[in-house]
């Protein structure tokens, strides 16, 4: 029987209290919702993942941030319970969206037994953290293992799945409650919970930590929670009306709306309006005429139809729930009870995921409202182009509730009261509509919607729809907002909605008419342009898509905004200023279709392109391939007919091209928004490459940028090439002298430059050969690189192990089993192996494989091994057959704490000479004839307490086949293990 480990020698990476705080924060902040594809993220107070890189910027807590204040409160509560040896219980619950704000319930303990929280909350998880006596024996786990297990459980929990499926939208109100585990349970699971027990690590020399969690079974869909207090809007509307008429009466009625004051902290992604109406919720100060009792907050819910976003409501149907505090408290400085704002960014308010009718999809209302807002925004932007168009009220940017939902206002008296209250609001003069009728809307609704904060997803959709509305020649259909006929302003808003539809259709039809005439210029105009500006264009005629139309008083200039660039060059600078443009954002054409579909796209005309060198060969090829020209070359101008095939209209002399490059005509100053296919490339080489039908020749120069964008996949993203293809110089270190003899490693063939598989072999610059060059004496030479036998730095072994050679490909399915033995035997680990192969010769000879075993998945420190003993690495191929078993003996007992070193074992096959005439020849020397067959590279590091770990990775070199030697030759395998000598160990970084 193995003796127990000495407790005094055991090293604990965390303090017991600190580890418990990390564990609690991982549970409470590990699923912080955010509006992203993942839908959630880890809070700033969560412990960093063990396998991740060190955090570059460490978070510093501030008392002004609610999350930091709540994290400090959580820390104090956990430490208080732990120091008194009391088990800790963490409960995770959901609350309905209708009556619980983003601040959550208060943190006092007076209303812990409030029946509302008992009925409304849905218990999801119950965690129990209990101290137990220290575990003994060799089968132990460390604190980081428990952290990894809890992080994995939190990542794959039901709550994380809901957040991921909704991209962080639902659930909105997540509550966490920390209490003593021996207290009476207040909440129970709606179904029989499933329980999971985690491994028990030792957190100190005398105490271990036992963690278990009970969770609600997996649900097929997100539950729609109903509020037990607010059953309908009629009740809420009556409460709001009573509150508007008398503050005392409203204060009495708020007793039933009061939320429990329990040690709960809540997270809410968005302010939560009632489930059937897209009402916006904002924190607003209480009204002066109705003072509130101390410690009580009010949440005002008001429609964006009658008010701006950041303006407190003044209409009676603002709904009173739990909400804001005194006006002195800003939005960012919410009380401590607002534990964590679930959204890193404050996105646009999204309606409730469910309706009174019981919608099952929580995202439908959000998508519909966002789409209607986008359409309304487009209409307002198009409205800027027409100074005679009526003003569009900002309230149109939120869709109104359908008439069918008005049935929830089941009281006739409530409706009459609401109408009376609304009539008192419309007293501010407002711009008139196109019929001359005055629209009287409250002044606060005049706030610009371009100042409204948008979520990244909404902003992306808005930009995409903006682009589509400017490019599509087909008039878009405007979604009509459903309005109530019973409201006082219903008819006025309906007229404004019709204006939206009219503006969109008129603007898009006008754009379509302009697009149709984009490239339909008359032949006479083209000839006039060519005769007047032939000296300036020098063989280049380009088209430019100008956005602003220019009209001359005499009518000579075309009103078409899409004119030839040559005409633009001769136009006076102030000609475009004769007619002011009322549009701050003119229509921009992003994609146009020409009548002639044979036009090939080329790069836009830019001034920077004229700095490139023009080779005579490429222009000679272009001139020879262009069979037809629209004008003689002696005129110095190439005219392009707009109704002829493109390949039959290009004829440019090389003299004109060189002159164009030297002079740089004024036509370089073109519109930056010009279409790529509406201009010829100013770079002759680019023009030759882009028009494949005209110039199928191949360029001799290769850009260095293309070399960086090759689609070669490295092992871990850190692989680099040995030499730069343009300079020929080594990238990582200086060249080494030429080897006079083979070293016995994976030596390279001298004709490596011919290998088609090497990524940089095809990108070498070669000397041009003359016309009478003899093919028999052909030898590819480098312009600046060292000889071919120096193409790799050192040898193949060093280049591959240090990622200096790019692999040709990877092989999936290899695995390895890593184990160790010595004073103790750690558990064997089976890990995947990233295997890649290379090409090292021109005869397609098989190259060895390189395998990388990543140990970072085992934790930051790696795989713990005894100070001395044996390490065994068994490599399996995809067929689960053993390829090689590496057995390495080591002794690192002299290694100091917080140091590192490495170990490399090589296995060679050394042939043995046969006996001739009864005489036995000696074996060949170690440097002659030996071939490297296998290699294993191990990295070791020691912790602060002197424990030895295999860390980072294990790198292997092994043969493609089992043994690549002559079957008739005598050989033997020899292994050599090497360690650094001076110094043998180095301090850890």
From Swiss-Prot:
Residues 413-423, 460-471, 656-675 have a biased composition (Basic and acidic residues). Residues 876-884 are annotated as: Transactivation domain 2 (TAD2). InterPro entries: Atos-like_C, Atos-like_cons_dom, ATOS_Transcription_Regulators. GO terms for cellular component: nucleus. Residues 397-412, 525-544, 600-638, 676-686 have a biased composition (Polar residues). Residues 244-295, 393-477, 525-639, 656-686 are annotated as: Disordered. Residues 792-849 are annotated as: Required for macropage invasion. Residues 254-270 have a biased composition (Low complexity). It is found in: Nucleus. Signal peptide: none annotated. Residues 24-32 are annotated as: Transactivation domain 1 (TAD1). Keywords: Nucleus. Its main location: nucleus. Transcription regulator that syncronizes transcriptional and translational programs to promote macrophage invasion of tissues. Belongs to the ATOS family. The protein contains 2 transactivation domains (TAD). Each of these domains may be required for transcriptional activation of a subset of target genes. This is Atos homolog protein A. The lineage of its organism: Eukaryota, Metazoa, Chordata, Craniata, Vertebrata.
């Amino acid at each position: 029987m193995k003796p127990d480990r000495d407790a005094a020698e055991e090293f604990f990476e965390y303090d017991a209290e600190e580890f418990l705080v990390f564990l609690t924060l991982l549970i409470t902040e590990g699923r912080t919702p955010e509006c992203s594809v993942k839908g959630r993220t880890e809070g700033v107070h969560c412990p960093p993942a063990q396998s991740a890189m060190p955090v570059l910027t460490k978070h510093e807590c501030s008392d002004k941030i609610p999350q930091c204040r709540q994290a400090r409160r959580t820390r104090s509560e956990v430490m208080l319970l732990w120091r008194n040896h009391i088990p800790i219980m963490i409960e995770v619950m959901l609350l309905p969206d209708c009556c619980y704000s983003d601040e959550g319930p208060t943190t006092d303990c007076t209303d812990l037994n409030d029946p509302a929280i008992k009925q409304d909350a849905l218990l999801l998880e119950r965690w129990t953290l209990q101290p137990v006596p220290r575990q003994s024996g060799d089968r132990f786990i460390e604190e980081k293992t428990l952290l990894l297990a809890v992080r994995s459980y939190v990542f794959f929990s039901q709550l994380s799945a809901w957040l991921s499926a909704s991209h962080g939208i639902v659930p909105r109100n997540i509550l966490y409650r920390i209490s003593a585990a021996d207290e009476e349970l207040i909440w129970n699971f709606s179904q029989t919970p499933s329980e999971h027990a985690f491994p028990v690590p030792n957190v100190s020399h005398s105490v271990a930590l036992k963690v278990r969690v009970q969770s609600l079974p997996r649900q097929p869909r997100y539950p729609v929670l109903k509020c037990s207090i607010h059953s309908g809007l009629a009740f809420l509307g009556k409460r709001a009306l009573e509150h508007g008429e008398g503050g005392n009466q409203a204060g009495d009625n708020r007793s039933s709306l009061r939320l429990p004051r329990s040690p709960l902290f809540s997270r809410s992604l968005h302010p939560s309006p009632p489930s059937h109406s897209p009402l916006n919720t904002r924190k607003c100060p209480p009204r002066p005429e109705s003072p509130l009792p101390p410690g009580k907050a009010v949440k005002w819910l008001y429609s964006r139809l009658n008010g701006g976003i950041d303006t407190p409501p003044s209409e009676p149907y603002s709904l009173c729930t739990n909400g804001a505090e005194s006006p002195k408290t800003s939005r960012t400085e919410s009380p401590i009870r607002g534990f964590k704002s679930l959204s890193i960014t404050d996105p646009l308010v999204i309606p409730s995921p469910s309706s009174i009718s019981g919608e099952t999809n929580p995202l439908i209302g959000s998508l519909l409202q966002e789409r209607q807002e986008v359409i309304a925004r487009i209409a307002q932007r198009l409205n800027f182009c027409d100074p005679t168009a009526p003003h569009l009220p900002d309230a149109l940017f939120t869709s109104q509730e359908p008439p069918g939902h008005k049935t929830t206002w089941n009281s006739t008296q409530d409706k009459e009261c609401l109408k009376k209250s609304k009539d008192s609001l419309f007293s501010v003069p407002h711009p008139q509509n196109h019929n001359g009728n005055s629209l009287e809307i409250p002044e606060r609704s005049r706030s610009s919607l371009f100042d409204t904060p948008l979520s990244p997803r909404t902003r992306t959709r808005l930009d995409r729809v903006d682009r589509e509305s400017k490019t599509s020649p087909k008039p878009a259909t405007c979604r009509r907002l459903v309005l109530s006929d019973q409201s006082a302003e219903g008819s006025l808003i309906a007229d404004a909605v019709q204006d939206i539809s009219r503006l969109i259709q008129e603007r898009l039809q006008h754009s379509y008419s302009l697009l149709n005439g984009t490239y339909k210029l008359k032949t006479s105009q083209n000839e006039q342009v060519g005769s007047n500006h032939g000296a300036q264009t020098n063989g280049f005629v380009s088209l430019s898509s100008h956005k602003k139309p220019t009209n001359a008083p005499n009518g000579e200039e075309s009103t078409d905004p899409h004119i030839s660039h040559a005409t633009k060059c001769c136009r006076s600078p102030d000609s475009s200023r004769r007619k002011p443009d009322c549009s701050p954002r003119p229509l921009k054409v992003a994609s146009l279709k020409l009548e002639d579909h044979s036009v090939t796209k080329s790069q836009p005309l830019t001034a920077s392109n004229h700095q490139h060198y023009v080779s005579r060969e490429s222009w000679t090829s272009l001139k020879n391939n262009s069979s037809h020209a629209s004008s003689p070359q002696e005129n110095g101008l190439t005219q392009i007919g707009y109704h002829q095939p493109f390949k039959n209209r290009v004829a440019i002399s090389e003299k004109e091209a060189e002159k164009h490059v030297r002079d740089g005509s004024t036509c370089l100053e073109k519109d930056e928004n010009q279409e790529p296919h509406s201009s010829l490339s100013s770079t002759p080489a680019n023009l030759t490459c882009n028009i494949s039908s005209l110039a199928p020749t191949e360029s001799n120069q290769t850009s260095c940028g293309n070399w960086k964008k090759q689609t070669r996949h490295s092992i871990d993203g850190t692989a680099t090439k040995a030499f730069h293809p343009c300079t020929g110089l080594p990238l990582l270190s200086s060249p080494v002298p030429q080897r006079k003899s083979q070293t016995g490693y994976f030596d390279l063939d001298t004709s490596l430059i011919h290998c088609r598989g090497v990524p940089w072999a095809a990108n070498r610059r070669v000397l041009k050969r003359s016309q009478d060059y003899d093919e028999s004496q052909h030898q590819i030479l480098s312009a600046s690189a060292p000889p071919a036998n120096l193409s790799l730095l050192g040898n193949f072994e060093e280049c591959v192990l240090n990622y200096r050679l790019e692999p040709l490909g990877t092989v999936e399915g290899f695995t390895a089993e890593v184990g160790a033995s010595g004073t103790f035997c750690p558990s064997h680990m089976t890990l995947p192996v990233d295997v890649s192969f290379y090409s090292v010769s021109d005869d397609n000879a098989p190259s060895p494989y390189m395998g990388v075993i990543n140990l970072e998945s085992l934790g930051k420190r790696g795989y713990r091994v005894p100070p001395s003993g044996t390490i065994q690495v068994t490599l399996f191929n995809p067929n689960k057959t053993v390829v090689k078993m590496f057995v390495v003996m080591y002794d690192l007992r002299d290694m100091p704490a917080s140091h590192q070193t490495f170990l490399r074992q090589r296995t060679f096959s050394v042939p043995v000479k046969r006996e001739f005439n009864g005489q036995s020849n000696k074996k060949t020397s170690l440097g002659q004839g030996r071939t490297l067959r296998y290699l294993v590279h191990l990295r070791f590091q020691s912790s602060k307490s002197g424990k030895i770990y295999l860390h980072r990775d294990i790198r292997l070199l092994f043969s493609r086949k089992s043994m690549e030697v002559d079957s008739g030759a005598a050989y033997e395998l020899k292994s050599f293990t090497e360690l650094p000598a001076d110094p043998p160990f180095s301090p850890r970084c």
